[in-house]
Amino acid sequence: MSEFTPREIVSELDRYIIGQNMAKRAVAIALRNRWRRQRLSAEMREEVYPKNILMIGPTGVGKTEIARRLAKLARAPFIKVEATKFTEVGYVGRDVESIVRDLVEMGITMVTEEAKVKVQFQAEDQAEERLLDILLPLPSTGQGEGSAHFGLFGQMEGSSVKPEPTAQQKESRQKMRKMLREGKLDDREIDIDLKEQRRVPMMEVITPQGMEGINLQDMLGGLMGGRTKTRRVKVGEAMKLLTEEEAGKLVDQDTVQQVAIERVEQSGIVFLDELDKVCARGSETRGGDVSREGVQRDLLPLVEGTTVSTKYGMVKSDHILFIASGAFQLAKPSDLLPELQGRLPIRVELESLGKGEFVRILTEPENALTRQYAALMGVENIELVFTDEGIEALAEIATRVNETAENIGARRLHTVMEKLLDELSFSAPDRGGERVVIDAAYVNRQLSDLAADEDLSRFIL
């Protein structure tokens, strides 16, 4: 769990997201409270429940970006889902409990990767020995060959016994090891045997009630797995593949599952987007709105705290933090079920973005669009320079189109930038060595006619 203070979390989010200070403060406090809770006594820790958050704001103002950056900061199991992907129990589609199952899968992946890092050096040593056995095989005594037999799925069981290497063989092996570590053998092609990961065709399996935690695809994959497959690869690639396989053997999966479930239960974060799309609008409760209300009712126990069956065991959602968000343009937060409103006690409204924010978005973040496009053109040996006047003109046009057409917030900058640099991107390979300056005149020449025509801008920008 992250040990950042709320001020440090906000500062980190400021590197990528402009404005929206109230939303940043809310998620920063929530994240810090997870850290505080971990340091309480066991009895008190059980009583401290997360204060779930509802972020309200139009599209393109930073709700999803805040969630994405928070995931990297949290160093905790994190999943982003759309409420519209789920259906009420009894309808065809995914049920809301699959949110927790997916979160557990994220936790398993995270803990497994951490465990592999810890055994990396040991795995590399074992992979190196396997490579040396392939590059410089020792002669077999032949003893035990008669006892070899084929197993249930056709793989040979039993192997020849290797003799003790002679002094000369040991010396040759050390020379080969030195060449291997120096990278002199990286381009040589060899055949290696890897455990085959059987791919089961993707299919949607509707399981009976009570069997949701059983993954039939994993069961089928397990039945067909276990074989080895010979691949011809270069030594450098072989080292990576063998290291990965050896690391997998060294990791204790039972421990991984226990740690992952504990981490999900105590530190898991779910970002639930598009919650407004499952609201019954106003007084309408007919047709599809019945199913929408059903999704909300299914979410209630999950957000409040329940036990979900997964293939790794039972998982409690009592202390999972839920951050919900929605534009709420057609529906209002008050259209949510009262019980669900009560389980989202912290409300944060995000402001719409205007010209001033667009100028900052184009210049201040570390991953600003202007820097991204300059880097892309730099690959073609073109120096792309944006002047302050050019950025002002870009922000002005994006704001104007948002006002006259659909307001999609900062996402409008992507469409404007693509149209602005369309000709340059196409002809870049033929213009290597040039210096292209994007000033107000360049922007107006490329975009002003389109932005001025309201009907045309709806389709192009």
Swiss-Prot record:
Signal peptide (residue range): none
Tagged with keyword Acyltransferase: no
Ligand binding (ATP): I18, G60, V61, G62, K63, T64, E65, D273, E339, R411
One GO MF term attached to the UniProt entry: ATP binding
Record keywords: ATP-binding, Chaperone, Cytoplasm, Nucleotide-binding, Stress response
Localization per record: Cytoplasm
Source superkingdom: Bacteria
Gene Ontology biological-process entries: protein unfolding; proteolysis involved in protein catabolic process
Coiled-coil stretches: none
InterPro entries found in the cross-reference section: AAA+_ATPase, ATP-dep_Clp_protease_ClpX, ATPase_AAA_core, Clp_ATPase_C, HslU, P-loop_NTPase
Chain intervals for the UniProt region annotation (Disordered): 157-178
GO cellular component annotations of the record: HslUV protease complex
SUPFAM superfamilies in the cross-refs: P-loop containing nucleoside triphosphate hydrolases
Protein purpose: ATPase subunit of a proteasome-like degradation complex; this subunit has chaperone activity. The binding of ATP and its subsequent hydrolysis by HslU are essential for unfolding of protein substrates subsequently hydrolyzed by HslV. HslU recognizes the N-terminal part of its protein substrates and unfolds these before they are guided to HslV for hydrolysis.
Family: Belongs to the ClpX chaperone family. HslU subfamily.
HAMAP family for this protein: HslU
Subunit record text: A double ring-shaped homohexamer of HslV is capped on each side by a ring-shaped HslU homohexamer. The assembly of the HslU/HslV complex is dependent on binding of ATP.
Protein name: ATP-dependent protease ATPase subunit HslU
Organism: Magnetococcus marinus (strain ATCC BAA-1437 / JCM 17883 / MC-1)
